[in-house]
Each structure stands twice: as structure tokens, then as C-alpha cells.
Amino acid sequence: MEKKISIAIDGPAAAGKSTVAKRLAEALSYVYIDTGAMYRALTYCALQRGVDVHNEKQLMNVLHDTYIELKPSPSGQLVFANGENVTEAIRTNDVTNNVSYVAKHPAVREEMVKRQRELGQHGGVVMDGRDIGTHVLPHAEVKIFLLASVEERAKRRHEENVLRGIPSDFEQLKEEIARRDQIDSERAVAPLKKAEDAIEIDTTSLSIDEVVDRIMCIVQERVEG
């Protein structure tokens, strides 16, 4: 494939966005950009400083003081905040339970979107998040919206936590995911919603390979078209 395009992958929490996006980027030799990790890095730094996640002004002070880097590695994307490797630290329950509150602040989103657009401006990227196709990369050649039931998403997150050695409660995860869906969908700025020209894929009963294969076919069509 000669032409380098932009691929936007959106969807609710634990719908498989990151796993699918990583596999696509690898298959296409594209750059993978996990925008959720950027919000998680900010959330982690704010919590470390004891900043109130509901205070936009304080969060913006933290954000302006924080240089977030996403670096590829053989084991997957590494996340750095001011030179500190926070890849594992941003996946704790504390960060997970607060990131939606951080991401709903208009000024925070505006600054993050600016940084994300700079990362994706030259194409050859697979970017995943909540508002990539609608807000960050509205002109992306391929837009995918991944869905899965709350039950299935909680199951996936539970298995992921167990693998990472993070304490995990399946029923609690179901409640937290449903709550995050509500916060993400109802926020005033760039809420979670499918772009009009996005292709919806329900991943509930599909394997990662099946989802990746479907998207690869769509990408092939756009590149050749």
C-alpha cells in the first residue's frame, strides 16, 4: 500500500479499540496513537499532585507543565510524562475511575486535541479514542466505530486486569463501564458519538483477528480507490 491515510477508531470504554488499533498499525507499518493514554497520563499526574479532577483550572496548570510522549516499542506503545515511564501506572483502577472526569473539561480537550492533531497531520496513523472521527481527525479517510455489550467489555477489562496483576471485580467493572459510557456520552464538549461517515462494527461476538481483517478490507478499498 503506497498511499498513507489516517484511520480513526472510536468507541466506548473496553470495546477493543487499542488492541485493534495496535494490530492495524503494525500490519500497515503506521504510527499508533492512543489518545486515551494521553488523558490517562494527565489524570495520573493530577492525582500524583493531589489535584481535584473536577477543577479545570488546576488540571490545565498540570497539563501545561506536562510533556506527554507516546513511543513505540517491541512490546507495544510506551507512555512517558515528563520523561517518566507511566505505561503501567496509567492503567490502575484509580486512574481508570477518574479519567472521564478529566476528559470532560473543555479546556483540557481543546489542548489535547491540538496535540493529537499535530501528531496525526501527516497521515500514516491509526488513532483511537472517543472523538477521533468526529472531532480530532474529522477528515480521516477511514472511520471505524467499535461497539460491544457492557457485559462483554467488563469481561475483557477483567481479563486484562488479571493479566496485569491488577485487583479486579467483574460486577464492579460492569457498573464502572456503564458509568463511563454515561459520562462520555453526555459531556458538553465532543461527546462520545459515532461520526456520520463511520462504519460501525459490533465486536461482541468477534475475535480480534476478525475485527482487524474487516477493517483491513475497508482500508484496502480506500487506499486503492
Curated annotation (Swiss-Prot):
Catalytic activity entry: CMP + ATP = CDP + ADP; dCMP + ATP = dCDP + ADP
Pfam family, one: Cytidylate_kin
Subcellular location: Cytoplasm
Enzyme Commission number, as recorded: 2.7.4.25
Keywords of the record: ATP-binding, Cytoplasm, Kinase, Nucleotide-binding, Transferase
NCBIfam families named among the record's database cross-references: cmk
Family of this protein: Belongs to the cytidylate kinase family. Type 1 subfamily.
Protein name as it appears in the record: Cytidylate kinase
Organism expressing this protein natively: Anoxybacillus flavithermus (strain DSM 21510 / WK1)
